[in-house]
C-alpha cells in the first residue's frame, strides 16, 4: 500500500499539496500516482510567473508507460519549479513527497483547499480505484 502522509492535502487527480505558510503551497504527485506511471523519464513543468486556475493542466509527467497531465489543485501564480527534475526525473519515483516535488503556487483563493481530500479521504479514493 502506498504511503499517504497525514499532514498533506490531496486532489482527486492524485496531486498532493503541502502548505509552506504565507499562502504558498508545494505540489507533487502521490506515491500511488508514480507507482501507476512507472519510471519517470521526463517532467515538463510550468513557467515560473505563470498564472494557473484550479483544474488547469499545467505540467506533464512522462514515464516509460505513459504521459500524464498534472493539474493545478489551486489557483494562483507559479512561484518555483523543481529544477532538479530536469536532470533527475526519477526523483518523482524515489521521493514523491520530498525531493520529487514539482512546483510551488502562491494561492489566489485559499478557500479552494476546502475541496481537497485529507489523507483518509484520499486513501478511500485509492482503495475504490483498485
Curated annotation (Swiss-Prot):
Keyword check for tRNA-binding: no
Record key words, sorted: Lipoyl
GO biological process entries: glycine decarboxylation via glycine cleavage system
InterPro entries: 2-oxoA_DH_lipoyl-BS, Biotin_lipoyl, GCV_H, GCV_H/Fam206, GCV_H_sub, Single_hybrid_motif
CDD domains recorded: GCS_H
A Pfam family matched in the record: GCV_H
Any one annotated GO CC term: cytosol
Free-text cofactor note: Binds 1 lipoyl cofactor covalently.
Residues with PTM N6-lipoyllysine: 65
Sequence ranges assigned to domain Lipoyl-binding in this UniProt record: 24-106
Known cofactor(s): (R)-lipoate
Protein role: The glycine cleavage system catalyzes the degradation of glycine. The H protein shuttles the methylamine group of glycine from the P protein to the T protein.
Subunit-structure text: The glycine cleavage system is composed of four proteins: P, T, L and H.
HAMAP family membership: GcvH (MF_00272)
Family label: Belongs to the GcvH family.
PANTHER family: GLYCINE CLEAVAGE SYSTEM H PROTEIN, GLYCINE CLEAVAGE SYSTEM H PROTEIN-RELATED
Name the UniProt record assigns to this protein: Glycine cleavage system H protein
Organism: Proteus mirabilis (strain HI4320)
Gene: gcvH
